[in-house]
């Protein structure tokens, strides 16, 4: 009995690390008129989406200053990458931060938990985290922000990372059962 209990706990604790970014599958095209709401923007999430001719939009509404990070990945299916860019807009649609994927040197990156290869694109963040190779989040003022994901023809798959802090909510066990091989 104790061995089963111990092994179950071990599997749970090992699997929890796989949720560094809480995965969110976006099955529609979030538009400027109907953007996808980013709840708790400091909590690390990965939004998986597919551009099908239109840019995608994500909105953050925060009543307090918060730590901001955004980065873009593209699935690595061959040696050619499809570049993507990020714009961060204020509530008046002015670009306040931009990560131009057409000018970025995209590098292959292996994601060990999902066991997938990606092209690592541009990021909007602070200094580089030497442990991860990704930028750290930075403090941004309270307000409304829109993240725009796009490229020249608005075609392609992407993973948009928002937030840096790891958090495991009440449905973590459900996610572990769903996502653990």
Show where each model-derived region lies.
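Non-catalytic, beta-strand-enriched accessory regions in extracellular/secretory proteins
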Residues: 36-67, 72-76, 83-86
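Extended, solvent-exposed segments with strong compositional bias
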Residues: 103-138
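Mid-chain, structured segments of secreted extracytoplasmic proteins
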Residues: 64-110
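N-terminal presequences and immediately downstream first alpha-helices
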Residues: 8, 19-20
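C-terminal edge strands of extracellular/lumenal beta-sandwich accessory domains
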Residues: 21-36, 58, 78, 84-94, ...
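N-terminal signal peptide c-region/cleavage motif recognized by signal peptidases
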Residues: 15-17
